[in-house]
Curated annotation (Swiss-Prot):
Residues 180-503 form the NACHT domain. ATP binds at residues 186-193. This is NACHT, LRR and PYD domains-containing protein 5. Residues 122-131 have a biased composition (Basic and acidic residues). SUPFAM superfamilies: DEATH domain, P-loop containing nucleoside triphosphate hydrolases, RNI-like. GO terms for biological process: actin filament organization; cortical granule exocytosis; establishment of organelle localization; establishment of spindle localization; exocytosis; positive regulation of embryonic development; protein storage; regulation of cell division. The lineage of its organism: Eukaryota, Metazoa, Chordata, Craniata, Vertebrata. Signal peptide: none annotated. GO terms for molecular function: ATP binding; structural constituent of cytoplasmic lattice. The keyword Protease does not apply.
């Protein structure tokens, strides 16, 4: 058992989120953050530091003054206020991860008035005779059911979890606080319940909590369900039915009492937060759930100690009920003990070694061997697989194959010779599988006589299953029966679906409802954590090897009915490329890895072209390698490789029998790199946000140099790869297929820049696009880069956004642009600290270099003076600029005048972005006069947040009507109102070329929807419309939906947040999409871009 550690990458992850914000967005974030800090006492910090902070220092500031989870929650709330849905979704996922980590690490909670201080801790005292009688009762109950060493010290030496458990109720040395609630949490089947029961036995033996507790009682959460009324005294009495003393005496000293509640994931914890419904009297009769919640919330017997067991999946719901708990994570057997139990000596050691060596990779098997019973199962399966040819074919070497080996051998008739199951025996097997499936779906793991009888498991059938060590009497007072381990129940539940392929067996729980058409619907089904492992077993069972063994056991063919449903699930997972790393995709890969069926896996992954995976464990690398190799049409891969833990299995493998070998973490990574570098169709590899060591980067780069590597685009945005970058530069020289490289957010030292530029100047380097945004570059770095521009025959695009290179650095770049061999076409210098003085050098470069077609200066304080200088070049008919981005450049009316004058002479400028400049209506009118000229070349114009009003809309309407080329106009965040929109609509009704119109947050209401609706039915070309953040209301939306559905409407992309409208309106929008399936209605309008997307505006 170990206490979880807060992930050290929280600060860096938050910094990465901030770096995704534009300059204006970042300032808005900081303003909202200061508002939040002034209202919240939980996260306060010096507000004056916020204004000066960049992304890195702001992330550090938040973590310095707030817990990691609170820093993420604060940021998530602000991202949602800013309508940044993608960032808020990612931040919410990160918040949950760090919240769970804090809970796990919090083994010493803050002192409250719940428990006594160190001075108040009850000291050792002699137990009375009645307590000793109870200890005898506990030892009689549990010692015959637990295979436990005689003394606690012996057990603790084999089970590391026991060490932390022995001191779970000790006071905190730093603050003196003694917890009265301890939570044991971990994955299912790891041995939490067994550990809790052993605790009772060791206490009874006097080895544990000596003198601290007079009584320790074990309650099962499933016994606290239902509406039946009882009292806490009655519950205790049932645990000691022949008590020689009244229960009142037992409960009279609650500070000497420990209550163990096992399996809290089975208890319904969505309890209304009304303390008035709870009770403090242990003699009062109430429904059992009320008693449970009263106990957990310390209303009932507040002085008693609680030890709770819960699966990780149920931990988040539980924490709201508890008062200052201590959380301890149960990890099961140590790796060394697992190895000893699995591969220890004995007469069959050679068989196990042979069977293990035949397997492809057994890390997942080792990971599941967390308790002795599973180790024994796997060990027996390895021995059986070591002597093939005895009746049943070997069902493979995966976890499913090993379980199938064990189960099929135990179920096979023990008659002389070998035969298949008889009809009666097949019926008993089906009944057992139905019982298991019923339990998995209903979270039921102990079955009474009625449950067994319903499924025909009585008498000889039940006796046979007990003899086979499959279904055993429950270890707690012998009530009911349970599978020998939870994983065995999950295996039989999966087998239930496979046996549907046997004629006449089609009833039971549907694996996936037939109406399921989306992954979102499926996620609601997969809430039960047991379904995850059941699903993996099911994929393993439909593999050819296991099916062959099963058909031999049954003596009849099994139709592959489950296979089609599994394919349907995989197809849903791959339906749409995710906006973030989806756990569903990685889980699908684990399932397919379990199948180990090449034909089936290739068919399942046939439609996958883009994947995004978060890889945290060595096994994640293995399953990803296996599946990515079989994604035949894969073109884009994003991998988040973060915090991969130390490979404990590989380290412990030195004690394995000679001749066996397990792959190290480095070897797993090398395999994955080999798959990526040799995939025939993969063109883009994105490792954004990953943390790669120098050795990991070296391995990757060596593989990327292979002749078979077809990757063209490498992305390391926000990745921690700087120590290994020197290996990347040589790769750029050797692999001429790599033409695009993005190192945004990677801190580059001067020596890194020098080495990179040497490679870029090499004649063999074919790099065409290089992004070095926010890399900490200096003017000296620009001098190195300028030499590349002057000599490279391939580099066409360079982005240096967010580097404070200043005027001096840009001067070096401009000098290089004037050199004849320079091939650069796209230059992005956003937020580089440029001033008006720089514009003279830029203008000079534009005059001499007609090959530069894209220029972005967004976020630089150019002002009117800078525009005056820049436009001297832009106005020339020889100027080759086609796309110019000047967002947030402090342009006003005067700047518009210079720009309008330049547009009169320029014949090539087709894209112009002026967002976040205070142009106001007079400046807009100046531009409109030029844009109405037939010779004006502008096609795309962005005017987001330019302080425009309805006064300029008449001019804009005339532009829409008269401009022969204008196709895109974005007016978001301008206060146009219904009047202004109505004026624009007059232009839309006329013959025009506009295909894209942005009206987000323009003050449109339901009153203006009638005019817009009429325009939509007339416009022949308008295909994309953004209406986000407008108060349209149900009435306005009803009017617009009529226009959306109109046959003459050509709309294909509509920006709307459907969830903000009532059900009636959402049904209308669904009707639109049913009538016109090609129409996309989404709040991600800016991602639904044409051609080269919004990148030119950066």
């Amino acid at each position: 058992m170990r206490e979880a550690k807060i992930a050290p990458l929280s600060n860096y992850g938050l910094q990465w989120c901030f770096e995704q914000l534009g300059k204006e967005e970042f300032q808005t974030f900081k303003a909202l953050l200061k508002e939040h800090a002034s209202e919240s006492a939980a996260c306060s910090f010096p507000l004056v530091q916020v204004d000066r902070a960049d992304a890195e220092s702001l992330a550090s500031l938040l973590h310095e003054h707030c817990r990691a989870s609170l820093a993420w929650k604060t940021s998530t709330d602000i991202f949602e206020k800013m309508s940044l849905s993608a960032l808020s979704e990612m931040a919410r996922d990160e918040m949950k991860k760090y919240l769970l980590a804090e809970i796990s690490e919090d083994s010493a909670p803050t002192k409250t008035d719940q428990g006594p201080s160190m001075k108040e801790v009850p000291g050792p005292r002699e137990d009375p005779q009645d307590s000793r009688d109870y200890r005898i009762h506990v030892m009689t109950t549990f010692s015959t059911r637990l295979d436990t060493p005689q003394r606690f010290e012996e057990f603790a030496s084999e089970c590391p979890d026991a060490h932390a458990l022995s001191g779970a109720f000790n006071p905190d040395p730093s603050g003196g606080f003694r917890p009265l609630t301890v939570v044991l949490h971990g994955p299912p089947g790891v041995g939490k319940s067994s550990l809790a029961r052993r605790l009772l036995l060791f206490w009874a033996q006097g080895d544990l909590y000596k003198g601290l507790f007079s009584y320790v009682f074990l309650l099962r959460a499933r016994d606290l369900q239902g509406s039946r009324e009882t009292s806490f005294a009655e519950l205790i009495s049932k645990e000691w039915p022949d008590a020689p003393v009244p229960v009142e005496k037992v409960l009279s000293q609650p500070e000497r009492l420990l209550i163990v509640v096992d399996g809290l994931e089975e208890l319904e914890l969505t309890f209304r937060d009304q303390d008035s419904s709870l009770l403090a009297d242990w003699a009062e009769r109430q429904p059992a759930p009320v008693l449970a919640h009263s106990l957990l919330k310390k209303v009932l017997l507040p002085e008693c100690a609680l030890l709770l067991t819960v699966q990780d999946a149920g931990l988040q719901r539980l924490q709201a009920l508890l008062r200052s708990p201590r959380y301890l994570w149960v990890g099961g057997l140590s790796v060394e003990n697992r190895m000893q139990l699995l591969l220890g000596g004995g007469k069959h050691c050679r068989r196990k070694t042979c069977a293990w060596h035949a397997g492809a990779d057994h890390q997942e098997v080792l990971d599941k061997c967390q308790v002795p019973v599973v180790c024994a199962l796997v060990r027996e399966a390895l021995e059986l697989q070591g002597e093939p040819g005895k009746g049943l074919p070997v069902p493979g070497h995966t976890l499913t194959g090993l379980y199938a080996t064990f189960v099929f051998q135990r179920l096979a008739p023990k008659d002389a010779g070998w035969r298949a199951l008889s009809g009666e025996e097949r019926g008993a097997l089906k009944g057992l599988c139905r019982l298991a499936a019923d339990g998995v779906w209903n979270a039921k793991f102990v079955f009474d006589g009625d449950d067994l009888g319903v499924h025909g498991l009585q008498g000889p059938e039940l006796s046979a299953l007990q003899q086979a060590s499959i279904l055993l009497p429950d270890g707690h007072c012998g009530r009911g029966h349970a599978f020998s381990h939870l994983s065995l129940q999950e295996f039989f539940a999966a087998l239930f679906y496979v046996l549907r392929g046997v004629e006449g067996d089609g009833e039971g729980y549907p694996l996936f409802p037939q109406s399921t058409k989306s992954l979102t619907e499926l996620r609601h089904i997969d809430l039960n954590v047991q379904l995850v492992q059941m699903k993996r077993f099911l994929f393993g069972l439909v593999s050819k090897e296991v099916m062959r063994a099963l058909e031999t056991l049954l003596g009849c063919p099994v139709r592959p009915v489950a296979k089609q449903q599994l394919l349907h699930w995989i197809c849903l997972v791959g339906q749409h490329p995710a906006a973030a790393a989806s756990p569903d995709l990685l889980e699908a890969f684990y399932c397919l890895f379990e199948a180990q069926d090449d034909e089936f896996v290739r068919l399942a992954l046939n439609g996958f072209q883009e994947v995004w995976l978060q890889l945290n464990r060595p096994m994640d690398l293995t399953v990803s390698s296996f599946c990515l190799r079989r994604c035949q049409h894969l073109r884009k891969v994003r991998l988040d490789v973060r915090g991969t833990p130390k490979d404990e299995f590989a380290e412990a493998w030195s004690g394995a029998p000679q001749g066996l070998k397990i792959k190290t973490l480095d070897e797993h990574w090398e395999d994955l790199c080999s798959v990526l570098s040799t995939h025939p169709n993969l063109r883009q590899l994105d490792l954004s946000g990953s943390v790669l060591s120098k050795e990991a980067m070296k391995t990757l780069c060596v593989k990327l140099r292979q002749p078979a590597c077809k990757i063209q685009n490498l992305i390391f945005k926000g990745a921690r790869v700087t120590p290994g970058l020197r290996h990347l530069w040589m790769t750029l020289i050797i692999n001429r297929n790599i033409t695009r490289l993005d190192l945004t957010g990677c801190r580059l030292r001067e020596e890194d820049v020098q080495t990179a530029c040497e490679a870029l100047r090499h004649p063999q380097c074919a790099l065409e696009s290089l992004r070095l945004d926010r890399c900490g570059l200096t003017p000296a770095s620009c001098r190195e880069i300028s030499q590349v521009l002057a000599t490279s025959g391939s580099l066409k695009s360079l982005s240096l956004t967010g580097n404070k290179v200043a005027d001096q650095g840009v001067k070096s770049l401009c000098d290089a642009l004037k050199v004849t061999p320079c091939t650069l076409q796209k230059l992005i210098l956003g937020s580089c600290g440029l001033t008006a003085a720089t514009c003279q050098d830029l203008a000079s470069a534009l005059i001499e270099n007609q090959g530069l077609t894209h220029l972005s200066l967004s976020g630089d304080e150019l002002g009117s003076k800078g525009m005056s200088l820049l436009c001297r070049a832009v106005k020339l008919s020889s100027c080759g600029l086609q796309k110019l981005a000047l967002n947030a450049c402090s342009l006003d009316v005067a700047g518009c005048g210079f720009l309008a004058f330049a547009l009169m002479g320029n014949r090539h400028l087709t894209h112009l972005s002026l967002s976040m400049n205070p142009l106001e209506d007079p400046g807009m009118n100046l531009l409109c006069e030029v844009m109405m000229e037939p010779s004006c070349p502008l096609r795309d114009l962005d005017l987001v947040n330019c302080r425009l009003t309805a006064s300029c809309c008449k001019s804009l309407s005339n532009v829409i009507t008269r401009s022969p080329r204008l196709r895109s106009l974005d007016l978001a965040a301008n206060a146009l109102g219904d009047e202004g929109i109505a004026a624009l609509c007059e232009g839309l009704k006329q013959k025009n070329t506009l295909t894209r119109l942005g009206l987000e947050a323009c003050g449109l209401t339901s009153e203006g929807c009638k005019a817009l609706s009429a325009a939509l039915t007339c416009s022949r070309h308008l295909a994309s419309l953004n209406l986000m953040r407008n108060d349209l209301g149900p009435r306005g939306m009803t009017t617009l939906c009529s226009a959306f559905m109109h046959p003459t409407s050509n709309l294909q992309t509509i920006g709307l947040w459907k969830e903000q409208y009532p059900a009636r309106v959402r049904r209308l929008l669904e009707q639109v999409q049913r009538l016109k399936p090609h129409v996309v209605i989404s709040d991600a309008w800016y991602t639904e871009e044409e051609e080269d997307g919004p990148c030119w505006r950066i």
